[in-house]
């Protein structure tokens, strides 16, 4: 197994991780930003108020994009397991 091959595996793993995590993180960021703007406009300083909308937005994103996320993860794992013999030989 060459260092280039290991770096390629690491690169593809990071790419899949970013693809799967970014929709969840972006939805939490947007909902938190909206709630923070509303809190600043109404001068409500409750720290725990933003958690429920974030949880709801993440659950909505998982519900909508869950099949796509599962497909991406399964494709990556299938390719990884399929290439195990070539990894061992190198």
Swiss-Prot record:
GO biological process, one term: bacterial-type flagellum assembly
Assigned keywords, A-Z: Bacterial flagellum, Cell membrane, Membrane, Transmembrane, Transmembrane helix
Pfam families with a match to the protein in the record: Bac_export_3
Domain of life, source organism: Bacteria
Regions annotated as coiled coil: none
Transmembrane portions of the chain: 18-38, 55-75
Main localization, broad class: membrane
Subcellular location: Cell membrane; Bacterial flagellum basal body
Protein purpose: Role in flagellar biosynthesis.
Family label: Belongs to the FliQ/MopD/SpaQ family.
UniProt protein name: Flagellar biosynthetic protein FliQ
Species for this entry: Buchnera aphidicola subsp. Schizaphis graminum (strain Sg)
């Amino acid at each position: 197994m060459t260092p280039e091959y290991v770096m390629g595996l690491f690169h593809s793993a990071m790419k899949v991780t970013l693809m799967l995590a970014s929709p969840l993180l972006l939805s939490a960021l947007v909902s938190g930003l909206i709630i923070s703007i509303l809190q600043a406009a109404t001068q409500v300083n409750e720290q725990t108020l933003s958690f429920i909308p974030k949880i709801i937005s993440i659950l909505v994103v998982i519900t909508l994009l869950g099949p796509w996320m599962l497909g991406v993860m399964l494709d990556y794992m299938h390719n990884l397991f399929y290439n195990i013999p070539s990894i061992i030989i190198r």
